[in-house]
């Protein structure tokens, strides 16, 4: 706004140029021009009825002040009523003072629907946006769910409620099965850390060889050897429990007691012991190698499969420590420390966790773990249903069978029978004999079929989804490992992280410059709404 002071008389105008009449602009006229508005004037920085020129994601429109005044609570309504340029700038992303145009870096498709809202007062849902993106856009422009049209409100609310679990119900759709780009990006970011590490290329190749069976021929051989060692360890543990080996160890223990030595010092079969030592050496090599080659030590200890590897070798070393504590003492000393042998037996039982090492090489086991992780609610509901049913039918069976000597002596004793019956296992070790007891057993079995089937269906759907998703993710990572990962990581080996960031900024500036050169010098005249 220009302020003119002519011979003591002040003139103000909103125009950038003011043409004074000839008498006022004649010779000897004193004119004072100022570009700042007078503080004591009530004139706004823009006219209240002036059309609002906006640019939303490249879509330019002129919005009438009358249409915006109908909805003063929206962002554009508040922008139209802004009292100053500073207040208006806080409501938009950028403002071009020369063109008097407000810029918003938002979705242009939603903006077209927003224009329809200012015309009709109703907002319609866009199929091109998911419910969450649509809700974010509506919140940004100051719209609530109450402005949704009646034809779209029910559909929007239904999609918003069912979207988090859509992959359970429609798991066959490609969008629910295909791996997310972020999942592959996580793998890329992990591998990119080798660029700044010492011997990064060698460590990267060794890491991919151990972690990805489809990376190369050596990785496939390594995977086969690892699976064979795990199976051999499990087989040795099972063979050790056979009666022949148990009788041999019992005879050796009797001979040790007769000789005045502790029976805990009896050693296992030499062949099985050597096989056990070999398996432990291989497992220790795997754990230590993965720890040394891991791109992130913190993430290594947070990964469930790595924790399983550690637990698989931990019992052996704990047994060695217990053996050192027991010592090789004889007589009374060995008897005093003999109770520590029970601890050794507990440590040996922990060897059963080695079977979980197969999860590293099995998509099904990993999918099962992911299913249990994301199905804790359904598992909790299943246990709650079983607990209620077992408690009810156990009390009924105890009341009907307590006079009979068939094992229903107490309600806690009936819990075993109720659990076996509700899960339709039916061992038959305890059965009712009275008519009332048999009716209670029939109700328990039918109730178990209904109760167990409901959550199991949901858990099965989740397992199917995670299995297909895991297979798709492995295929995507395997395909990208051969060429895309090699190109990415080769560039990482040559430049540092700072250089990568600089190159990204330069490329972004170049793209911006290209867009500016391609843009027309005169913007098209926006449409009026």
Curated annotation (Swiss-Prot):
SUPFAM superfamilies named among the record's database cross-references: POZ domain, Voltage-gated potassium channels
Gene: KCNS1
Membrane spanning stretches: 218-239, 271-293, 305-322, 341-361, 377-398, 439-467
Cited Pfam families: BTB_2, Ion_trans
MF annotations from Gene Ontology: delayed rectifier potassium channel activity; potassium channel regulator activity
UniProt-recorded name of the protein: Delayed-rectifier potassium channel regulatory subunit KCNS1
Family statement drawn from the similarity comment of this UniProt entry: Belongs to the potassium channel family. S (TC 1.A.1.2) subfamily. Kv9.1/KCNS1 sub-subfamily.
Cytoplasmic side, ranges: 1-217, 294-304, 362-376, 468-529
Primary localization: membrane
Intramembrane segment boundaries: 412-423, 424-431
Residue numbers covered by motif Selectivity filter: 424-429
One GO-annotated biological process of the protein: potassium ion transport
């Amino acid at each position: 706004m220009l302020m003119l002071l002519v011979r003591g008389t002040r003139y103000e105008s909103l125009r950038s140029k003011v043409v004074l009449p000839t008498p006022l602009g004649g010779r000897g006229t004193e004119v004072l021009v100022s570009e700042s508005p007078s503080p004591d004037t009530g004139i706004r920085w823009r006219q209240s009825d002036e059309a609002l020129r906006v640019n939303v994601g490249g879509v330019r429109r002129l919005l009438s002040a009358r249409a915006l005044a109908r909805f003063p609570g929206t962002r554009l309504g508040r922008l139209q009523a802004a009292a100053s340029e500073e207040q208006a700038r806080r409501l938009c992303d950028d403002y071009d003072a020369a063109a008097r145009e407000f810029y918003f870096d938002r979705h242009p498709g939603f903006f077209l629907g927003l224009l329809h809202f200012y015309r009709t007062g109703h907002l319609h849902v866009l199929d091109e946006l998911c419910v969450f993106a649509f809700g974010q856009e509506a919140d940004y422009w100051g719209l609530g769910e109450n402005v949704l049209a009646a034809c779209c409100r029910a559909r929007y609310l239904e999609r918003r409620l069912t979207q988090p679990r859509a992959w359970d119900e429609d798991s066959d759709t490609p969008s629910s099965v295909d791996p997310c780009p972020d999942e592959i990006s996580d793998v890329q970011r992990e591998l990119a850390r080798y660029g700044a590490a010492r011997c990064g290329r060698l460590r990267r190749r060794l890491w991919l060889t151990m972690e990805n069976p489809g990376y190369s021929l050596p990785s496939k051989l390594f995977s086969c050897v690892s699976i064979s060692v795990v199976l051999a360890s499990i087989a040795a543990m099972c063979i050790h429990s056979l009666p022949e080996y148990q009788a041999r160890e019992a005879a050796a223990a009797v001979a040790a007691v007769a000789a005045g030595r502790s029976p805990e010092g009896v050693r296992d079969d030499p062949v099985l012991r050597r096989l056990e030592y070999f398996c432990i050496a291989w497992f220790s090599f795997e754990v230590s190698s993965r720890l040394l080659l891991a791109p992130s030590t913190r993430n290594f200890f947070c990964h469930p499969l790595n924790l399983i590897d550690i637990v698989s070798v931990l019992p052996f070393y704990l047994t060695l420590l217990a053996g050192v504590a027991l010592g090789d003492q004889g007589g009374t000393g060995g008897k005093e420390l003999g109770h520590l042998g029970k601890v050794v037996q507990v440590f040996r039982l922990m060897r059963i966790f080695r079977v979980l090492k197969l999860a590293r090489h099995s998509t099904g086991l990993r999918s099962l773990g992911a299913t249990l992780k994301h199905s804790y609610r359904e598992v909790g509901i299943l246990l709650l249903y079983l607990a209620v049913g077992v408690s009810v039918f156990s009390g009924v069976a105890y009341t009907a069978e307590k006079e009979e000597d068939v094992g229903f002596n107490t309600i806690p004793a009936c819990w075993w029978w109720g659990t076996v019956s509700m899960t339709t296992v039916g061992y038959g070790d305890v059965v009712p004999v009275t008519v009332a007891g048999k009716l209670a057993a029939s109700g328990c079995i039918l109730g178990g079929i209904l109760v167990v089937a409901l959550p199991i269906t949901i858990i099965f759907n989740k397992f199917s989804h995670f299995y297909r998703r895991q297979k798709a993710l492995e295929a995507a990572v395997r395909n990208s490992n051969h060429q895309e990962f090699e190109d990415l990581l080769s560039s990482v080996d040559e430049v540092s992280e700072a250089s990568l960031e600089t190159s990204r900024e330069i490329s972004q500036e170049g793209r911006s410059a290209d867009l500016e050169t391609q843009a027309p010098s005169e913007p098209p005249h926006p449409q009026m709404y």
